[in-house]
Amino acid sequence: MCGYNGSIHSVSKVRVLQIVCKTSIYYSIITIKFQCGTIEQDMKLLFAQGNPGRQYARTRHNTGFIALDALAEAQGATWSTQTKFRADIAEISVQGEKVLLIKPLSFYNETGQIARGLVDFYKLEPSEDLLVIHDELALPFGTIRVRQKGSDAGNNGIKSINAHLGENYARIRVGIWNERHDIMDDADFVLSAFSEEESKLLSTLVETKITPLISAFVKGELEPVSHKLDV
């Protein structure tokens, strides 16, 4: 038989609940600790850069969203809109570890606050638990580079995340440049849609290149900045 002895106290954000349990021989005290307002879990976050809305769904700027959609579909995961976090979230398992796929509901250049909210809520360490997937205008389409940390390199979405979390987190940069960029300004180009051929190649990239990189990240084996994949 157990009974609550009225002893609940707070230490910082951790509450301690003591329960007195009686058996036929002795009394014992069970102490339970739990976090207030946050959850501490062993998990990883895959955070995609992109813009919400159907009009942006197949655009170059939404490369990160497209990649996570493919990952979710491959594992039969379902997206859920979480207004608390201002994000669409799906859960998958990679190497037996829980991984949350995140598509922020803010626009591309304002994603940092959402990333910070998730990291704080789950008490994660960005340098170990956060991987951002985004398009990279400076790289040719079909090229993937891994970066372990660093400046935004002119990417406003990364600039926003850096402002809220610092620069020490991993990124997968997916090249989107092609010759059409030479006759378009940057804003129009990144918001232009992939061709049918490019969409097929992007699917192949996700399956054969990006997915193995994600597995490496989960295992703590993601290769450093010099790592480059060309297709």
Task: Name these PLM-found stretches.
Residues I25-D42:
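Short, Lys/Arg-enriched N-terminal segments with co-localized hydrophobic residues
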Residues T38-K149, K159, A163-A170, E179-D185, ...:
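Nucleotide and nucleotide-moiety/phosphate-recognizing core
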Residues G154-G157:
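Hydrophobic alpha-helical segments within soluble ligand-binding/sensing domains
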Residues D188-L202, P212:
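Active-site-adjacent mobile loop/cap segments within catalytic or ligand-binding domains
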